[in-house]
Amino acid sequence: MEPHGHSGKSRKSTKFRSISRSLILCNAKTSDDGSSPDEKYPDPFETSLCQGKEGFFHSSMQLADTFEAGLSNIPDLALASDSAQLAAAGSDRGKHCRKMFFMKESSSTSSKEKSGKPEAQSSSFLFPKACHQRTRSNSTSVNPYSAGEIDFPMTKKSAAPTDRQPYSLCSNRKSLSQQLDYPILGTARPTRSLSTAQLGQLSGGLQASVISNIVLMKGQAKGLGFSIVGGKDSIYGPIGIYVKSIFAGGAAAADGRLQEGDEILELNGESMAGLTHQDALQKFKQAKKGLLTLTVRTRLTTPPSLCSHLSPPLCRSLSSSTCGAQDSSPFSLESPASPASTAKPNYRIMVEVSLKKEAGVGLGIGLCSIPYFQCISGIFVHTLSPGSVAHLDGRLRCGDEIVEINDSPVHCLTLNEVYTILSHCDPGPVPIIVSRHPDPQVSEQQLKEAVAQAVEGVKFGKDRHQWSLEGVKRLESSWHGRPTLEKEREKHSAPPHRRAQKIMVRSSSDSSYMSGSPGGSPCSAGAEPQPSEREGSTHSPSLSPGEEQEPCPGVPSRPQQESPPLPESLERESHPPLRLKKSFEILVRKPTSSKPKPPPRKYFKNDSEPQKKLEEKEKVTDPSGHTLPTCSQETRELLPLLLQEDTAGRAPCTAACCPGPAASTQTSSSTEGESRRSASPETPASPGKHPLLKRQARMDYSFDITAEDPWVRISDCIKNLFSPIMSENHSHTPLQPNTSLGEEDGTQGCPEGGLSKMDAANGAPRVYKSADGSTVKKGPPVAPKPAWFRQSLKGLRNRAPDPRRPPEVASAIQPTPVSRDPPGPQPQASSSIRQRISSFENFGSSQLPDRGVQRLSLQPSSGETTKFPGKQDGGRFSGLLGQGATVTAKHRQTEVESMSTTFPNSSEVRDPGLPESPPPGQRPSTKALSPDPLLRLLTTQSEDTQGPGLKMPSQRARSFPLTRTQSCETKLLDEKASKLYSISSQLSSAVMKSLLCLPSSVSCGQITCIPKERVSPKSPCNNSSAAEGFGEAMASDTGFSLNLSELREYSEGLTEPGETEDRNHCSSQAGQSVISLLSAEELEKLIEEVRVLDEATLKQLDSIHVTILHKEEGAGLGFSLAGGADLENKVITVHRVFPNGLASQEGTIQKGNEVLSINGKSLKGATHNDALAILRQARDPRQAVIVTRRTTVEATHDLNSSTDSAASASAASDISVESKEATVCTVTLEKTSAGLGFSLEGGKGSLHGDKPLTINRIFKGTEQGEMVQPGDEILQLAGTAVQGLTRFEAWNVIKALPDGPVTIVIRRTSLQCKQTTASADS
């Protein structure tokens, strides 16, 4: 059949080209003429269509359109009868296809005729490639969509779907938003977010859609009444912005035209394409109140609209899409009447219309995309705006199919893309070629009928698609090379196997044939050779033509998914004779890569070894793929992915094919979807998770990416990795022995015995096969426990597991810590840690040991005072605790001292000799290793087996901050500010590291590691009480804070606790404890920076606080942020401290404090959204390190209550006593008509609450610029006290003052006073 179409095309291509150009009618009935015209037809698009792939080209283009339109429903309805006759009609298809006149339209037209007369013929007509191509070109947009989507049962059954499949491949590739619809379509598959799942349902890729403008009124302080979902950062990959839900009582609900699932293309003429979710939200928030114009793509039928109660929204969407009530009528379900009324509905003529576009004015053409219906498929004109260029021209009509715009064929373009082309045409003549029936009434009627059919198809498409013949669906799906999303949808829908195959087949064939087309070129390159590759990598084809080629690395996973479809492929093969050879190749490829994908990694179980997984992946037909639906498949994918990520695994392939996270996510998701299909209906839930697995691995290591729970992902990934890799690493590396303590040592000294003991203790089946690297952890990853920190502390204190552990690990651990202690490797370790963190996604067995070693060395180096890693860890921990208690509140100082005393005792115990220290040291070292995410996980497991004190939660918490440390280095700013920020970021990163190590060390009972300097005569006295207080504090401790001045003192050599007051002593202990956590390299840098600071900057350190909050995973920090570089360039400050939040309980962070960094991420120069993102990311870890700066005004705000000048003066003096930074100055300024030359902020009832009135900005050109400075607090104005006044009232006071000299009493920080006092006195 295909050769038939090709030969006809080649013979008559020239002739028909000229004919088509002259708008000659073609008789679709004559199979010979039809075929040749059809083929000739493609000739105009010959570049893409030649090779009999013309159909592919068109189909792919149309597929994209179909995607948007979601037209597959119509094809299903139209082709229902045809599908039954597919086999018989197969021979006739080529002939009927030839009937198609010029392009997709001609093909669709012929299909209509055929369908009208002999349904068998129409279906067959759809199948022949030449026909298919035309069908695709005309209906492919519909067919590919339907075939790939909801209408699989019917549309796929018909031959048209096969033609469209190539189109679908192209289209899928073309429109990511449409692709999104596909994966979403499968409700069976659990989506990562409810919104996405809903979107998927709404987006049902087979539905027809229209683009329309909706005008909504935005009130002040009010939204538009709907929420959005999607964006280029979606877990499904780059997609458009969709309406998630519409709120009752909102503007959108009142308007009634916008409906859930609509894609928002433009806002007030600004494209929403390529925006992240946050950017889109910001656009809506920044939109000014008033009328907003939304350009939306509305599906004529959405799954909800299938229900009777949803039909009204459908009508609304139709009307809105048409931008007029008239539109709804043409598309209403009732309007469709059989276009068969016309004698020859398949006839088509090509008309070229040139419209003159004016600058800033659109053409007024309303577009819609509908699925294949008889002779209707593609992108059509559904309405003309009254008074528009197109309307006044009068040559375009409703029902015209768009064929070319500016000499560019649109068959392979999606509805969104065609709309973009039309809306962005340059001013001047815009040539548009349309295809229509000679009788415009027929074209319009056909369009109405197609829309109605699409609506009906949506209603019944899902069921049909589930119940339709599997063989037909498979054939069609195999013909349709759908993107990953499509595949996922199909998988989720009833026919997963054949879908995967269809996707593979189509994508490969399409890609090979579509090389000429923008979307298909990549596919064309690799389509032919990919058959084998595809077998290996079913995913790649689904991802995209380009991806198909690269998927080879990911082949192992895909084969598993696709293996079950093999029988289906065989069935398809029986049908394929009707189809092109391409389809055969595709089918074969599909089967090879059709193995079901593993279930969600969260539920990952290592039932099969990684090798088995790999083998299964390689073997498409291997029954293991089917037998191991969840555990084996998941392990197969997870382990190979983790192991092969470095070697260009599926992720690399995906990235190469589709640059950007979207492509990779789509690929993985599609693969998962396919595997799930084959495996079972339940498996679909895993697809979403599996792609996330890859992401998580990467995200876990970069703290910035915390969209998902890093620990859950890391633990899952690590389990997979560790079972094969980590065990090997542990056995090979001493670090891991330290890390896992019992495990490592046992593994090295007596691997079997130690491991078995640990396993038995934990009661978790841990099989460590270092040699195989296929270690399988049957038990789920140890989940972090909210109270792990407190529990570990209590357990350490009360329990004597140290002696137990020492016997097991002592010999092995002691030597390793010593070797790791050397400071030389430490700096490298710190840098390597960061690098490794950033590349955690690529971690491997070899890397893990290195990381562990580096981690260990780092910790020892950070604790310079102690040579042994164990001691250092303990010291750090105790120091941190001590610091927290000391800094957080003065009343905690005693607790800190007692803690320090307790720690000294423990340290003394360890200090006496290495032999004693090794047991504790071993634990500390293990914890030290734990900072590395992989190591932590391992140690967690081992620790869990060992005892509750050693439970992994602490390690996990530690590992999380490690990722943050990288970001800590971030931005160094100008002069003083930059220095302060750099120091704060270094400290926060160091504290994060220390915290990571801290919980483990505490749990291990390594509190003893405290610098000897810290140990004071007082400390021994408070040992027992300190231990209790410490344990209790840890149990109920929400966090602690520490003043940077304390660290400065320590770094300057003021480390002797006895030199200063108790407060100073406590602070020095705190500083020492924090500094002990730093590596030698980091400490040296910090000291150098502190030494370079001038006195003024050093004084500012007193107002900078490092606050460490201990919290549950997912819990907020208890405060909100205000300000940002995009909001009047204001610094990020604490907007509000929630009464019962962590920050409020800890007490250091106050409203108005400037936030310098969070978890090592500097907020200097950050926009408000960036700051909020960083704050949200801080939810995931169990600890949060916040560096804040408290202004003197804030520090002394409580004292500013008096309203008279005397009271204010006294208050100022009191403040100066408490805070050495503030002084009162009297300044005389000259008042002019322009005022005093400065602006005010604060005052009673300000945005930040009741604040003192301060000078916000000095106006340029004012002489008093040197007299006053921003930040000065205004106490009096010409003898009038302004305390307690609002800013408005204060301005009224200033305005009432006469022109001339005005005496002002201000309060200024000591840093500013030196510069201003002299001028003020003079």
From Swiss-Prot:
Residues found modified as Phosphoserine? S917
Primary location class: secreted
- GO biological process annotations for this chain's record? induction of positive chemotaxis; leukocyte chemotaxis; positive regulation of inflammatory response; positive regulation of interleukin-1 alpha production; positive regulation of interleukin-12 production; positive regulation of interleukin-6 production; regulation of calcium ion transport
**Tissue expression:** Isoform 1 is expressed in neurons of the cerebellum and hippocampus. Isoform 2 is expressed in thymus, spleen and lung.
Q: Give the protein's biological function.
A: Interleukin-16 stimulates a migratory response in CD4+ lymphocytes, monocytes, and eosinophils. Primes CD4+ T-cells for IL-2 and IL-15 responsiveness. Also induces T-lymphocyte expression of interleukin 2 receptor. Ligand for CD4.
| Quaternary structure, from the entry | Homotetramer. Isoform 2 interacts with GRIN2A. Isoform 1 interacts with GRIN2D, KCNJ10, KCNJ15 and CACNA1C. Isoform 2 interacts (via PDZ 3 domain) with PPP1R12A, PPP1R12B and PPP1R12C. Isoform 1 interacts with PPP1R12B. Isoform 3 interacts with GABPB1. Isoform 2 interacts (via PDZ 3 domain) with HDAC3.
The protein depicted here goes by the name Pro-interleukin-16
Q: Which organism is it from?
A: Mus musculus (Mouse)
